A protein has these predicted regions:
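Phosphodiester-processing cores and adjacent nucleic acid-binding clamps
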Residues: 1-343, 347
Length: 350
Protein backbone atom coordinates (compact mmCIF):
# COMPACT_ATOMS: atom_id res chain seq x y z
CA UNK A 1 0.00 0.00 0.00
CA UNK A 2 1.32 3.44 -0.98
CA UNK A 3 0.44 6.78 0.64
CA UNK A 4 1.12 10.21 -0.81
CA UNK A 5 3.01 12.14 1.90
CA UNK A 6 3.97 15.25 -0.09
CA UNK A 7 0.88 17.01 -1.43
CA UNK A 8 0.14 20.65 -2.26
CA UNK A 9 -3.46 21.80 -2.33
CA UNK A 10 -5.08 25.05 -3.47
CA UNK A 11 -3.79 26.49 -0.19
CA UNK A 12 -0.25 26.45 -1.55
CA UNK A 13 -1.22 29.79 -2.97
CA UNK A 14 -0.58 30.33 -6.69
CA UNK A 15 1.29 27.02 -6.80
CA UNK A 16 -0.93 24.11 -5.83
CA UNK A 17 -3.87 23.33 -8.12
CA UNK A 18 -5.55 20.56 -6.11
CA UNK A 19 -9.08 21.43 -5.01
CA UNK A 20 -9.63 19.65 -1.72
CA UNK A 21 -12.78 17.69 -2.54
CA UNK A 22 -11.48 16.67 -5.96
CA UNK A 23 -8.13 15.65 -4.48
CA UNK A 24 -9.66 13.46 -1.79
CA UNK A 25 -12.20 11.96 -4.20
CA UNK A 26 -9.40 11.00 -6.57
CA UNK A 27 -7.36 9.46 -3.75
CA UNK A 28 -10.42 7.46 -2.71
CA UNK A 29 -11.02 6.32 -6.31
CA UNK A 30 -7.41 5.15 -6.50
CA UNK A 31 -7.99 2.97 -3.44
CA UNK A 32 -5.79 5.00 -1.11
CA UNK A 33 -6.54 4.72 2.57
CA UNK A 34 -4.50 7.74 3.72
CA UNK A 35 -3.45 11.09 2.29
CA UNK A 36 -1.28 13.97 3.52
CA UNK A 37 -1.51 17.73 3.13
CA UNK A 38 1.82 19.59 3.05
CA UNK A 39 1.20 23.09 1.78
CA UNK A 40 4.00 25.63 1.43
CA UNK A 41 4.66 27.48 4.69
CA UNK A 42 1.08 27.46 5.95
CA UNK A 43 -1.68 25.29 7.37
CA UNK A 44 -4.65 27.27 6.05
CA UNK A 45 -6.24 24.20 4.53
CA UNK A 46 -5.64 21.71 7.35
CA UNK A 47 -9.15 21.74 8.86
CA UNK A 48 -11.02 21.69 5.54
CA UNK A 49 -8.72 18.94 4.27
CA UNK A 50 -9.32 16.92 7.44
CA UNK A 51 -13.09 17.24 7.08
CA UNK A 52 -12.98 16.34 3.38
CA UNK A 53 -10.99 13.20 4.17
CA UNK A 54 -13.31 12.17 6.97
CA UNK A 55 -16.36 12.58 4.74
CA UNK A 56 -14.88 10.17 2.21
CA UNK A 57 -13.31 7.64 4.56
CA UNK A 58 -9.69 8.60 3.89
CA UNK A 59 -7.29 8.97 6.83
CA UNK A 60 -5.94 12.56 6.86
CA UNK A 61 -2.28 13.25 7.64
CA UNK A 62 -1.67 16.85 8.65
CA UNK A 63 1.66 18.39 7.71
CA UNK A 64 3.46 21.30 6.11
CA UNK A 65 6.35 21.95 3.75
CA UNK A 66 8.17 24.60 5.75
CA UNK A 67 10.82 27.03 4.59
CA UNK A 68 14.10 26.79 6.51
CA UNK A 69 16.30 29.88 6.72
CA UNK A 70 19.96 29.42 5.69
CA UNK A 71 21.12 31.04 8.93
CA UNK A 72 18.58 32.11 11.56
CA UNK A 73 14.99 33.22 11.09
CA UNK A 74 15.99 36.70 12.25
CA UNK A 75 18.66 37.27 9.56
CA UNK A 76 17.51 39.38 6.62
CA UNK A 77 20.48 40.21 4.42
CA UNK A 78 19.34 40.08 0.82
CA UNK A 79 22.31 38.18 -0.60
CA UNK A 80 22.66 35.54 2.12
CA UNK A 81 19.13 35.16 3.45
CA UNK A 82 16.81 35.37 0.44
CA UNK A 83 17.57 31.72 -0.28
CA UNK A 84 15.74 29.12 1.81
CA UNK A 85 15.31 25.36 1.82
CA UNK A 86 12.21 23.19 1.94
CA UNK A 87 11.47 20.56 4.59
CA UNK A 88 8.45 18.27 5.04
CA UNK A 89 7.01 17.90 8.56
CA UNK A 90 4.15 15.48 9.32
CA UNK A 91 2.15 15.33 12.56
CA UNK A 92 2.50 11.99 14.30
CA UNK A 93 0.29 13.00 17.23
CA UNK A 94 -1.21 15.99 19.04
CA UNK A 95 2.17 17.05 20.42
CA UNK A 96 3.50 17.16 16.87
CA UNK A 97 0.54 19.25 15.72
CA UNK A 98 1.09 21.77 18.49
CA UNK A 99 4.78 21.94 17.68
CA UNK A 100 4.10 22.36 13.97
CA UNK A 101 1.60 25.20 14.40
CA UNK A 102 4.03 26.87 16.81
CA UNK A 103 6.80 26.80 14.20
CA UNK A 104 4.57 27.84 11.30
CA UNK A 105 3.24 30.77 13.35
CA UNK A 106 6.73 31.91 14.30
CA UNK A 107 7.72 31.62 10.66
CA UNK A 108 5.33 34.51 10.01
CA UNK A 109 5.77 36.54 13.19
CA UNK A 110 9.55 36.17 13.57
CA UNK A 111 11.03 34.75 10.39
CA UNK A 112 9.19 36.33 7.48
CA UNK A 113 11.56 37.47 4.73
CA UNK A 114 10.06 36.89 1.27
CA UNK A 115 8.69 33.66 2.80
CA UNK A 116 7.67 32.59 6.33
CA UNK A 117 10.90 30.91 7.51
CA UNK A 118 11.75 28.75 10.47
CA UNK A 119 15.28 27.74 11.49
CA UNK A 120 17.25 25.05 13.27
CA UNK A 121 16.65 26.71 16.62
CA UNK A 122 12.88 26.25 16.24
CA UNK A 123 13.34 22.70 14.99
CA UNK A 124 15.39 21.84 18.07
CA UNK A 125 12.68 23.26 20.34
CA UNK A 126 9.66 21.84 18.51
CA UNK A 127 10.64 18.56 16.80
CA UNK A 128 8.81 16.19 19.14
CA UNK A 129 5.83 14.36 17.67
CA UNK A 130 6.85 15.13 14.09
CA UNK A 131 8.10 12.96 11.23
CA UNK A 132 10.51 14.75 8.90
CA UNK A 133 11.20 14.16 5.19
CA UNK A 134 14.11 15.77 3.35
CA UNK A 135 11.82 17.37 0.71
CA UNK A 136 12.17 18.08 -3.00
CA UNK A 137 15.01 19.53 -5.09
CA UNK A 138 14.71 22.69 -2.98
CA UNK A 139 15.58 20.76 0.18
CA UNK A 140 18.86 21.39 1.96
CA UNK A 141 20.31 17.96 1.19
CA UNK A 142 19.29 17.88 -2.50
CA UNK A 143 20.79 21.34 -2.93
CA UNK A 144 24.09 20.18 -1.45
CA UNK A 145 24.09 17.14 -3.74
CA UNK A 146 23.42 19.33 -6.78
CA UNK A 147 26.40 21.45 -5.74
CA UNK A 148 28.48 18.25 -5.67
CA UNK A 149 29.09 18.74 -1.96
CA UNK A 150 28.45 15.23 -0.67
CA UNK A 151 30.13 15.87 2.68
CA UNK A 152 27.77 18.76 3.39
CA UNK A 153 24.80 16.64 2.37
CA UNK A 154 25.90 13.86 4.70
CA UNK A 155 26.55 16.24 7.59
CA UNK A 156 23.11 17.78 7.13
CA UNK A 157 21.37 14.40 6.91
CA UNK A 158 23.06 13.22 10.10
CA UNK A 159 22.09 16.43 11.90
CA UNK A 160 18.41 15.94 11.07
CA UNK A 161 18.55 12.23 11.84
CA UNK A 162 20.14 12.89 15.23
CA UNK A 163 17.53 15.54 16.00
CA UNK A 164 14.37 13.70 14.94
CA UNK A 165 15.58 10.16 15.63
CA UNK A 166 16.18 7.22 13.33
CA UNK A 167 12.46 6.41 12.94
CA UNK A 168 11.36 10.01 12.43
CA UNK A 169 13.62 11.18 9.61
CA UNK A 170 13.57 9.98 6.00
CA UNK A 171 15.45 10.79 2.81
CA UNK A 172 12.87 11.66 0.15
CA UNK A 173 13.12 10.18 -3.35
CA UNK A 174 11.26 11.83 -6.24
CA UNK A 175 11.28 11.12 -9.97
CA UNK A 176 9.40 13.30 -12.42
CA UNK A 177 11.78 12.70 -15.30
CA UNK A 178 13.85 15.76 -14.38
CA UNK A 179 17.63 15.23 -14.92
CA UNK A 180 18.59 16.90 -11.63
CA UNK A 181 16.52 14.35 -9.74
CA UNK A 182 18.66 11.51 -11.05
CA UNK A 183 21.75 13.17 -9.58
CA UNK A 184 20.00 13.78 -6.27
CA UNK A 185 18.50 10.29 -6.04
CA UNK A 186 21.89 8.68 -6.61
CA UNK A 187 23.27 10.76 -3.76
CA UNK A 188 20.34 9.95 -1.50
CA UNK A 189 20.74 6.22 -2.12
CA UNK A 190 24.41 6.49 -1.21
CA UNK A 191 23.57 8.48 1.92
CA UNK A 192 21.04 5.87 2.97
CA UNK A 193 23.57 3.06 2.51
CA UNK A 194 26.27 4.85 4.47
CA UNK A 195 24.16 6.28 7.29
CA UNK A 196 21.26 3.86 7.60
CA UNK A 197 18.76 6.70 7.22
CA UNK A 198 15.63 5.19 5.60
CA UNK A 199 14.22 6.22 2.22
CA UNK A 200 10.70 7.27 1.32
CA UNK A 201 9.13 7.84 -2.11
CA UNK A 202 6.92 10.85 -2.81
CA UNK A 203 5.55 12.61 -5.88
CA UNK A 204 5.37 16.25 -4.75
CA UNK A 205 1.75 16.42 -5.89
CA UNK A 206 0.67 19.84 -7.22
CA UNK A 207 -2.38 18.88 -9.30
CA UNK A 208 -4.86 16.01 -9.29
CA UNK A 209 -4.56 14.63 -12.83
CA UNK A 210 -1.84 14.74 -15.44
CA UNK A 211 -3.94 16.91 -17.73
CA UNK A 212 -4.16 19.52 -14.95
CA UNK A 213 -0.49 20.43 -15.37
CA UNK A 214 -1.41 23.45 -17.49
CA UNK A 215 -3.63 24.80 -14.71
CA UNK A 216 -0.64 24.79 -12.41
CA UNK A 217 1.42 26.58 -15.06
CA UNK A 218 -1.23 29.31 -15.17
CA UNK A 219 -0.94 29.75 -11.40
CA UNK A 220 2.84 30.10 -11.67
CA UNK A 221 2.42 32.71 -14.41
CA UNK A 222 0.01 34.70 -12.24
CA UNK A 223 2.42 34.50 -9.30
CA UNK A 224 5.38 35.70 -11.38
CA UNK A 225 3.55 38.18 -13.65
CA UNK A 226 4.27 36.21 -16.83
CA UNK A 227 2.18 34.77 -19.64
CA UNK A 228 2.10 31.15 -20.74
CA UNK A 229 5.14 30.22 -22.76
CA UNK A 230 7.46 32.67 -21.03
CA UNK A 231 10.28 31.46 -18.80
CA UNK A 232 9.16 32.14 -15.24
CA UNK A 233 12.10 30.41 -13.60
CA UNK A 234 9.65 28.36 -11.55
CA UNK A 235 8.05 26.07 -14.14
CA UNK A 236 8.41 22.35 -13.52
CA UNK A 237 9.33 21.23 -17.08
CA UNK A 238 7.29 18.10 -16.40
CA UNK A 239 3.65 17.03 -16.26
CA UNK A 240 4.31 14.30 -13.69
CA UNK A 241 3.45 16.18 -10.48
CA UNK A 242 -0.02 14.66 -10.22
CA UNK A 243 -1.71 12.24 -7.81
CA UNK A 244 -0.31 9.02 -9.19
CA UNK A 245 -1.73 5.60 -8.45
CA UNK A 246 0.04 3.04 -6.32
CA UNK A 247 0.83 1.08 -9.48
CA UNK A 248 2.46 4.09 -11.15
CA UNK A 249 4.60 4.81 -8.10
CA UNK A 250 5.56 1.12 -7.82
CA UNK A 251 6.74 1.14 -11.42
CA UNK A 252 8.84 4.28 -10.93
CA UNK A 253 10.48 3.05 -7.73
CA UNK A 254 10.64 -0.67 -8.50
CA UNK A 255 14.34 -0.70 -7.58
CA UNK A 256 13.69 0.66 -4.07
CA UNK A 257 10.53 -1.07 -2.79
CA UNK A 258 11.38 -0.15 0.80
CA UNK A 259 10.88 3.52 -0.11
CA UNK A 260 7.29 2.68 -1.08
CA UNK A 261 6.70 0.50 1.97
CA UNK A 262 7.90 3.29 4.24
CA UNK A 263 5.08 5.56 3.05
CA UNK A 264 2.56 3.21 4.61
CA UNK A 265 4.71 2.76 7.70
CA UNK A 266 4.72 6.52 8.20
CA UNK A 267 0.99 6.81 7.46
CA UNK A 268 0.13 4.25 10.15
CA UNK A 269 2.08 6.25 12.71
CA UNK A 270 0.39 9.57 11.95
CA UNK A 271 -2.65 9.51 14.22
CA UNK A 272 -3.55 13.10 14.92
CA UNK A 273 -7.25 13.97 15.04
CA UNK A 274 -8.95 17.32 15.49
CA UNK A 275 -11.53 17.51 18.27
CA UNK A 276 -14.36 19.64 16.97
CA UNK A 277 -17.15 20.84 19.25
CA UNK A 278 -15.04 20.77 22.41
CA UNK A 279 -14.37 24.08 24.12
CA UNK A 280 -10.63 24.47 24.66
CA UNK A 281 -9.83 27.25 27.06
CA UNK A 282 -6.37 28.84 27.26
CA UNK A 283 -3.97 27.54 29.87
CA UNK A 284 -2.93 30.21 32.37
CA UNK A 285 0.44 29.94 34.10
CA UNK A 286 0.05 30.93 37.74
CA UNK A 287 2.87 32.35 39.91
CA UNK A 288 4.97 29.54 41.34
CA UNK A 289 2.72 26.91 39.80
CA UNK A 290 -0.05 27.68 42.29
CA UNK A 291 -3.33 25.79 41.89
CA UNK A 292 -5.41 27.73 39.36
CA UNK A 293 -8.64 27.81 41.32
CA UNK A 294 -6.86 28.75 44.54
CA UNK A 295 -5.09 31.59 42.74
CA UNK A 296 -8.37 32.79 41.22
CA UNK A 297 -10.02 32.75 44.66
CA UNK A 298 -7.11 34.75 46.05
CA UNK A 299 -7.42 37.44 43.38
CA UNK A 300 -11.18 37.75 43.83
CA UNK A 301 -11.02 37.97 47.61
CA UNK A 302 -8.22 40.52 47.45
CA UNK A 303 -10.37 42.54 45.04
CA UNK A 304 -13.30 42.46 47.46
CA UNK A 305 -11.08 43.69 50.30
CA UNK A 306 -9.82 46.57 48.13
CA UNK A 307 -13.39 47.63 47.41
CA UNK A 308 -15.18 46.96 50.70
CA UNK A 309 -12.49 46.70 53.36
CA UNK A 310 -11.55 43.83 55.65
CA UNK A 311 -15.17 43.18 56.68
CA UNK A 312 -17.40 43.33 53.59
CA UNK A 313 -21.16 42.74 53.95
CA UNK A 314 -22.12 39.10 54.48
CA UNK A 315 -24.35 39.12 51.39
CA UNK A 316 -21.37 40.17 49.25
CA UNK A 317 -19.19 37.40 50.63
CA UNK A 318 -21.88 34.78 50.04
CA UNK A 319 -22.43 36.04 46.50
CA UNK A 320 -18.70 35.88 45.76
CA UNK A 321 -18.48 32.30 47.03
CA UNK A 322 -21.48 31.32 44.91
CA UNK A 323 -19.92 32.86 41.80
CA UNK A 324 -16.55 31.21 42.48
CA UNK A 325 -18.14 27.78 42.92
CA UNK A 326 -20.16 28.20 39.71
CA UNK A 327 -17.07 29.19 37.70
CA UNK A 328 -15.15 26.20 39.05
CA UNK A 329 -17.97 23.75 38.27
CA UNK A 330 -18.21 25.03 34.70
CA UNK A 331 -14.45 24.70 34.22
CA UNK A 332 -14.01 28.38 33.39
CA UNK A 333 -11.26 29.23 35.88
CA UNK A 334 -8.54 29.54 33.22
CA UNK A 335 -10.88 31.60 31.05
CA UNK A 336 -11.37 34.19 33.78
CA UNK A 337 -7.67 34.21 34.63
CA UNK A 338 -6.91 34.90 30.98
CA UNK A 339 -9.41 37.78 30.93
CA UNK A 340 -7.71 39.26 33.98
CA UNK A 341 -4.33 38.92 32.28
CA UNK A 342 -5.65 40.72 29.18
CA UNK A 343 -7.52 43.50 30.97
CA UNK A 344 -4.99 44.41 33.69
CA UNK A 345 -2.55 46.32 31.42
CA UNK A 346 -5.47 48.35 30.04
CA UNK A 347 -6.77 49.15 33.50
CA UNK A 348 -3.37 50.37 34.70
CA UNK A 349 -2.81 52.41 31.54
CA UNK A 350 -5.89 54.55 32.14
Amino acid sequence: MFTHLHVHTEFSLLDGACRLDDLVSRAKALGMQSLAITDHGNMYGAVDFYKACKRQGVRPIIGCEVYVAPRTRYDRERVQDKAYNHLILLCENEEGYKNLIAMVSKGYTEGFYFKPRIDRDLLQKHHQGLICLSACLAGEIPQALLERDYDKAKETALWYSDLFGSEHYYLELQDHGIPEQQTVNAGLLRLSRETGIPLVATNDVHYVRREDAKIQQVLICIATNHVLGEDTGLEFHSDQFYLKSEEEMAEIFAAVPQALENTEKIARRCNFDFEFGNTKLPYYETPGGMDHYAYFQKLCREGMVRRYGQHPPKAYVERLEYELNTIQKMGYTDYYLSLIHISEPTRHAQ
